[in-house]
A protein has these predicted regions:
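Interfacial loop at the N-terminal end of multi-pass membrane proteins
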Residues: 2-61, 67-73, 108-113, 117
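Hydrophobic cores of alpha-helical transmembrane segments in multi-pass inner/ER membrane proteins
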Residues: 56-63, 126-138
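Structural signal for the C-terminal ends of transmembrane alpha-helices
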Residues: 65-72, 139-145
Length: 145
């Protein structure tokens, strides 16, 4: 991959991982600490997680464009690109599943008295999965020569 694209890919993966880290491990816990009610914090967190979804989608789609086979020059780096691409795709799928599957179930569980703990826990695990995928992508891209 050309030098500019390689640097842009590292930048995108850093943005993806950093935004997941900042939101999930700093911003949302602070919302629950400082807002008056947990319901108010949860509503704000939901909006922020939704915005994070679209940032993640943009970063992963651009990464996938940069990692396609036409941009990879050598067979050895092609194999590495496939591994990195797999982490990006898994992260993208988790992002979309949380936004369009789990988030809706959390809203339904809150409204109907359903199993909110189950859906919140599943969403948290999937968010952690996204964070791991983004971190592995950043790690592998930043160590490429």
């Amino acid at each position: 991959m050309p030098a500019f694209q390689a640097r842009a890919a590292v930048f995108l993966s850093a943005l993806w991982w950093g935004s997941l880290s900042g939101l999930g491990f700093v911003v949302v816990p602070l919302l629950f600490k400082y807002l008056i009610t947990p319901a108010e914090a949860g509503a704000m967190a939901a909006k922020l997680f939704s915005a994070q979804t679209w940032l993640s989608v943009a970063c992963t789609m651009l990464l996938l464009l940069m990692l396609n086979r036409k941009n990879v020059e050598h067979a050895q780096s092609n194999d590495e690109a496939r591994k990195i691409t797999a982490w990006v795709v898994v992260g993208l799928l988790l992002t979309l599943l949380v936004e369009f599957g789990v988030a809706a179930q959390i809203v339904n569980a809150r409204a109907s008295g359903g199993n909110l703990r189950l859906w919140h826990g599943l969403g948290s695990l999937m968010y952690l999965g996204q964070w791991i995928c983004a971190g592995l992508t950043l790690w592998r891209l930043s160590s490429r020569k």
